[in-house]
Amino acid sequence: MNRWVEKWLRVYLKCYINLILFYRNVYPPQSFDYTTYQSFNLPQFVPINRHPALIDYIEELILDVLSKLTHVYRFSICIINKKNDLCIEKYVLDFSELQHVDKDDQIITETEVFDEFRSSLNSLIMHLEKLPKVNDDTITFEAVINAIELELGHKLDRNRRVDSLEEKAEIERDSNWVKCQEDENLPDNNGFQPPKIKLTSLVGSDVGPLIIHQFSEKLISGDDKILNGVYSQYEEGESIFGSLF
């Protein structure tokens, strides 16, 4: 793996995931620490969830994704309505142009990396701050990867003895992903109105090997029951589904 990708993408993903969980009220605000984690010279601290199990989960998720990065072209955090298990928001990082191999003539500075990632995270924060507030305990989240030529599930051997934490992690990373299809949970009936999605392009990164595109998707039209009870306030003149204009 390219040394710049390995070094800084891990920090970037930690900020990215925690910012979404905080601003979308996936977990209560009081479960986040606001005063200890600062990265990429952001003007404010990044809220980091304090729950030990979630800290471990996010750290392992990031290491898992990085271990598969040559196959992964998109990483998404999906916001799921607890009442119906449907995705109502999606935050996407596109890695399709990442450079995975070190180049001898490639010279970038830490300042350049910090500038790019700071702009990217600031773009995400400004977008999240404008979204309708989410009611308490109405949503959860899922991590999703889009991958090419990634084979999983071949290392699971119930008779195999696991002698180290490294072996345990290797087996879990091979078996803890579930294959799914886009929109597979949507209601299967003739009366269901297909959803309409609002796509918002956000600032990514374009420095050396760290070429990342960032965007978000938000459900704005469809069956009223999909979003019922999730959002507590809306922009003036906007319905529960937002505006199509």
UniProtKB/Swiss-Prot annotation:
SUPFAM superfamilies: The spindle assembly checkpoint protein mad2 (SSF56019). It holds the Pfam family HORMA. It comes from the Eukaryota. Residues 3-203 form the HORMA domain. PROSITE patterns: HORMA. It is found in: Mitochondrion. The keyword Transferase does not apply. Keywords: DNA damage, DNA repair, Mitochondrion. One of its GO terms (biological process) is error-free translesion synthesis. Gene3D superfamilies: HORMA domain. Coiled coil: none annotated. InterPro entries: HORMA_dom, HORMA_dom_sf, Mad2-like. One of its GO terms (cellular component) is chromatin. Belongs to the MAD2 family. Forms DNA polymerase zeta with REV3. Interacts with REV1. PANTHER family: MITOTIC SPINDLE ASSEMBLY CHECKPOINT PROTEIN MAD2 (PTHR11842), MITOTIC SPINDLE ASSEMBLY CHECKPOINT PROTEIN MAD2B (PTHR11842:SF10). Required for DNA damage induced mutagenesis. Involved in DNA repair, mitochondrial DNA repair and translesion synthesis. Has a role in the bypass of abasic (AP) sites. This is DNA polymerase zeta processivity subunit. It comes from Saccharomyces cerevisiae (strain ATCC 204508 / S288c). The gene is REV7.
